[in-house]
Amino acid sequence: MDFNYDDTQKKHAAMIAQVCAEQLAACGNEHSRYFTARQWAICGEAGLLGLSIPREYGGQGLGALSTAIAMHAFGLGCTDMGLVFAAAAHQFACAMPIVEFATAETKRDVLPKLASGEFIGSNAITEPEAGSDSSNLKSRAWPQADGSYRLDGHKSFAGNAPIADIFVTYATTQPEYGALGVSGFIVHRSSAGLRVSEPLDKVCLRSCPAGEVFFDDCRVPEVNRLGEEGQGRQVFQSSMGWERACLFAAFLGMMERQLEQTIEHARTRRQFGKPIGDNQAVSHRIAQMKLRLESARLLLFRACWGMDQGDPGQLNIALSKLAISEGALASSIDAVRIFGGRGCLESFGIEAMLRDSIGTTIFSGTSDMQHEIIARELKL
C-alpha cells in the first residue's frame, strides 16, 4: 500500500498552494464575508472549478482520489472556506450530476461553462419540510403535451443560489412511487417562473451565498431531465458521494492548517515563564487534534479509492464525512481554547474555522444521518 502522492497529484497540490498564496490571499475579502467575482475568476483560471469534470468538456478530468487531494490543498491554502465551499458545491453537487446523467447535447452546452466558471452552479433539493428526509419532496413536475415539464415548488438553503446561472433540482414526477418517483432536472436562471431570494444571513461559510429558490409554473424542456424519469434518487445519491468525499477533503485541509497554526501558537505563546505547549492540558488537546486529522485522512482516502474502483460504498463515504465533520468541530473548539481570547478575534482566523466547522455537521447530510447510514450498512 503506497501512501505517497503520484507526480500528477503533487503537481496539482503545489499549483493550488501557489494560487492560494499568491492570488487568493491578496483578495482580502473583508474576513470572507462576501462572495467576490474576482476570487471566482481566479479559481476558474486555475482549474479549481472543474477538477472532476472530464477534459473533453474543459475540466481537469481527475478521479475521486486525485480530486480529494486537490481539494485538500485548496482547503489547506485558502483561508476563505466559503469560497472553497462554493467551488465544491458548484462542481460536485451541480456539475457531476450533469456529467453522469445529462444528455450528450446538454453536456456539450453546459459543462465547459461550468468548468471555466462562466456559469455558476447550484444544487436545490432541500425544502422547508424536507431536509434530511429528501425523498419527501413537495415540489412537483408535471409532464406536458409538448414533452416539457411544468415545475412548481419551493427550495431552501440552496448553496450559490443567489449568484447561480444553472440549478440542478429535484421534484416528484410519480408520487405513487414515493422516493422512486423523484426526478432530477437542470433549470437555467433565465427560465420563466424561477425566482431566487436574497442571500440568507448565516453563521458560517458567508462568502458562499445561500438562498431560497421558487418554481412557479416553470417550464423545463425534456432534454434538461437528468437520467430517466424517476431516477432522481440515484442522481442525488451519486452527487452526494462526490460532495461528501471531495468537498470534505477541503475541510481536512482546514483541519491541517488549523493544527499548524495551533502548534505554532503553543510554541511561541509564553505564560508563567514557559511556552503554553509545555502544559499537558494544551499538549494533549493538540495530540487529539492530530489524531482526528490523521484518522479522517485515512478514512477519506479509502472512500475515494473505492469510488475510483467503481465501488462508491455509502459506508466508507459516511464514515469519512462523519469523521471530518465531527473532527473539524471538536478541533476548532480545542483551537479556540488554546488561543484563548485571541481565538475569539476575527484577525486570528480561528473563530472563522469554528463557525465554518459547525456547518460541516449539517450540510451534505447531517452527522446524525451519517450515523443512520453507517448503522444501516452494518445491517442494524
UniProtKB/Swiss-Prot annotation:
Active site per UniProt: E243
SUPFAM superfamilies per record: Acyl-CoA dehydrogenase C-terminal domain-like (SSF47203), Acyl-CoA dehydrogenase NM domain-like (SSF56645)
Name of the gene: pltE
Keyword set, alphabetical order: FAD, Flavoprotein, Oxidoreductase
Cofactor requirement: FAD
Name of protein: L-prolyl-[peptidyl-carrier protein] dehydrogenase
Role description: Involved in the biosynthesis of pyoluteorin. Catalyzes the desaturation of the L-prolyl-[PltL] to yield 1H-pyrrole-2-carbonyl-[PltL].
An example Gene Ontology molecular-function term: acyl-CoA dehydrogenase activity
